[in-house]
């Protein structure tokens, strides 16, 4: 690996910035040792002493800096805070790239190598992040295995965290670190960087070991008073810079953030419901839907399958489109879209029942965003377990619902079940999209069975550059029977069409289990 690193065509200088303040000397020694052990050798380490007061550290620092000519010791005259220390290091950094190493954490020996190796393949990238775990007295545990770039997930939490590689000039262009966000200064910086670039890459390897200590947020974010508040302010400032009317709340149970956007215009939504119910059953279904929907501008279109005399053409609050011999559900949905003119479309299974009246408004907050193609909800079974919370591709066949069977209010691994985030696909049991997007990608593929057509629709949106959003805030009960039989013919079509993304879903780390989509480490 060291020999390969020396043969890289591009061998940029990496400036590692490590602010130091009253660090236990053994821990700082471990951090420095991990840098000295790097197989990629073109680096510099800047130790920025932020006015330390402990005698043993002050005595040790010069000797530690003298261990290697690539280590530089910088002293601040007084304790100024982590942002000031990092900015000082940034001013003095000579590298084209900067990385950040906390004074008590540890790098894997190939941490720099893996990042520079990625640059050989993708020289245009601006930001690189990798996976991490916790460092304890017993060793390494609690790996955090991250998805590829997920902008909605990033507004729910700073999942990038460690290890971060950034172009030095880009960090300077966005203004460096802002002291008013100390405690979450890295989150604020990364939010500003994300406003300038989407050239963001992920290395799915644990390259950083975050020390868990009594006063570290690696153990509990509450160990650093003000960190949540600083993160909240950073997200608010980010949304304001983007011109988005929104407010941010904190889930104090999970310490995740929730962005609620202002609905700029409640555009008309056609709620498209396939049904084979008789008149009375359908009437009850519609009455329940209307009573639990506060969104002000929608109509209901029922796709009636079966005999003509089951339902009148109009039954009060909805319109009926009839199909005696429809090829499949995809064909009926495509036809229904052609018969409506609303700018937004909601595909809703008759077995779905809203729990809270603002469910459709919550989904509309996301579909109004130009970068979003489709929005899915949290679907809950009659047993109060998760029926659907976004699809993970390539798990147990073509796809499996994330956290399927988990208690409905369970946080999920690393709190992900209760966070707004991106997936490659969401369920057509409750899916909101825009007409222009639906038409751009050609609608549902009528050659595919219902469940796979939903996934295929989302993947076509992803290929066209749109995001798929899952929001756990929109909650519905789902009485839709699970499809027990696999359609091998349709699965073969999907595997041929989407082989790359089925092999590796970008929103599901390759080191996670492929047996179940529960986000636990694979064996």
Q: Can you say where each PLM-predicted feature lies in the sequence?
A:
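Nucleotide-sugar donor-binding/catalytic module of glycosyltransferases
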Residues: 1-223, 237
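Short, acidic, metal-binding catalytic loop of nucleotide-sugar glycosyltransferases
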Residues: 33-42, 287-297
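Conserved donor NDP-sugar-binding/catalytic core segment of glycosyltransferases
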Residues: 110-141, 353-397
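N-proximal low-complexity "stem/linker" segments adjacent to membrane-targeting elements
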Residues: 1-34, 244-288
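Short beta-strand-to-loop acidic/aromatic patch adjacent to the donor-nucleotide binding site
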Residues: 95-106, 342-355
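A recurrent flexible, glycine/aromatic-enriched loop bordering the glycosyltransferase active site
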Residues: 83, 91, 141-165, 338, ...
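Donor nucleotide-sugar recognition loop
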Residues: 175-191, 226, 353, 421-477, ...
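C-terminal, non-catalytic tails of nucleotide-sugar-dependent glycosyltransferases
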Residues: 1-9, 224-266, 383, 395-422, ...
